[in-house]
Design a protein with these regions (language model features):
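A generic structural motif
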Residues: 34-40, 85
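Beta-rich strand-turn-strand
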Residues: 56-92
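Disulfide-stabilized netrin-like
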Residues: 46-59
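Structural motif
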Residues: 6-8, 28-30, 48-50, 72-74, ...
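OB-fold and OB-like beta-barrel modules that bind single-stranded nucleic acids
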Residues: 7-13, 33, 69-81, 99-102
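Conserved short histidine dyad/triad with adjacent acidic residue
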Residues: 13-16, 55
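Acidic, gly/ser/pro-rich intrinsically disordered tails
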Residues: 1-5, 17-26, 40-46, 61, ...
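Short, acidic/hydrophobic/Gly-rich beta-strand patch recurrent on exposed beta strands
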Residues: 30-35, 52-55, 95-97
Length: 118
């Protein structure tokens, strides 16, 4: 039996990505990707999902270097769950998308050309 945990998204960055360091000196970036739905809602309008993605190390570094707000990217990754126990012993469950690969479908240069043409 093949077991699969894979997420694929294509969308636009909501803001410029920023690079941070984790406690154990790994590079990390948290991005949000705007992904329009392929169908209209009851009012005849397209909705957009804003999906949070976590990037590590070289994936994070390269995304920060080559992308900015509005860049179109492809994300290939996986879902990862975690549990955080609060002081009152209440457990909070989180599901995150961890990027394994980012494909740059537009670049900062492409975006700058679009702005200059406007």
């Amino acid at each position: 039996m093949n077991i699969l945990n894979q997420v694929i998204l294509v969308g636009r960055l909501v803001k410029d990505p920023e690079l941070r360091d984790t406690e154990n000196s790994k590079k990390i970036s948290y991005i949000t990707v705007a992904v329009p739905r392929s169908f209209k809602d009851a009012n005849g309008e397209y909705q957009t999902d804003f999906i949070n993605v976590t990037l590590f190390d070289m994936v994070a570094k390269n995304t920060v270097e080559y992308c900015k707000k509005g860049s179109i990217i492809g994300v290939k990754g996986r879902l990862q769950t975690s549990v955080v126990e609060k002081e009152n012993e209440e457990k909070k469950y989180y599901t995150d998308i961890i990027a394994e690969k980012i494909t740059f479908l537009s670049s900062k240069q492409d975006d700058n050309l679009e702005e200059a043409a406007s």
